[in-house]
Amino acid sequence: MKITAVLFDLDGTIIDTNQLIIKSFVYTVEKHLGYKIGAEEVIPYFGEPLPLTLQRFSKDKWEIMLKTYRDYNEKYHDRYTKIREDVKEVLARLKEEGIKTAVVTSKRRELAKRGLKLFELDKYFDVLVGLEDTEKHKPEPDPVLKALELLKSPREEALMVGDSPYDILSARSAGVRSVAVKWSVLPFELLKKEKPDYFIEDMWQLLKIIKGCDEDEHEQ
């Protein structure tokens, strides 16, 4: 089936916010709970909505921790955020080929926009679906379905690219083929367990997948 739309997760997929997220959690937990945590205690929850992760640390204090986390995260956002290799070049190619694009993230819209604008990526995306845009979030299908609705694209002609099991599960439950990135900070076996339709080792391989899907359609 020809691919006419590609949906992308944001953090860890097209921009690298791993250090920002880890530092934000370390600071927040130490401030409110009085002990230090390591990256290994945070990384397994990458990809899920922030309130849920904070509730894993404290059912009582998660709301005040949420404010602290967001304040720290916004303050140091630009310092600890980097763009993933070849992202801009591949997005430009997708644009040239007339393929619609969307960001589908569990992050708040304004902070997601900030990350895109920081690297001048916003011009490559037709749609942004953030935390506020759906009641249910990944791994539920709602964010993916919302993006497809806004793009006016059929699920059969879409791909969802992400770095976590939540991206794969959200895509599958929405009836969309999934692409897992091998540069995820999460263990490869964790992604493999969810059986994504494709794996890519770099962004350029995404174009090969799209081309392969187009060729399959022509052979039918």
UniProtKB/Swiss-Prot annotation:
Entry EC no(s): 3.6.1.1
Entry's transmembrane regions: none
Catalytic activity: diphosphate + H2O = 2 phosphate + H(+)
GO cellular component, one term: cytosol
Cofactor(s) demanded: Mg(2+)
Biological process terms in GO annotation: DNA repair
GO molecular function, one term: phosphoglycolate phosphatase activity
UniProt-listed SUPFAM superfamilies: HAD-like (SSF56784)
Key word Magnesium present: yes
Residues at the active site: D9 (nucleophile)
Key words of the record: Hydrolase, Magnesium
Sequence similarity: Belongs to the HAD-like hydrolase superfamily. PpaX family.
Protein name, per record: Putative pyrophosphatase PpaX
Annotated organism of origin: Caldanaerobacter subterraneus subsp. tengcongensis (strain DSM 15242 / JCM 11007 / NBRC 100824 / MB4)
Gene (name only): ppaX
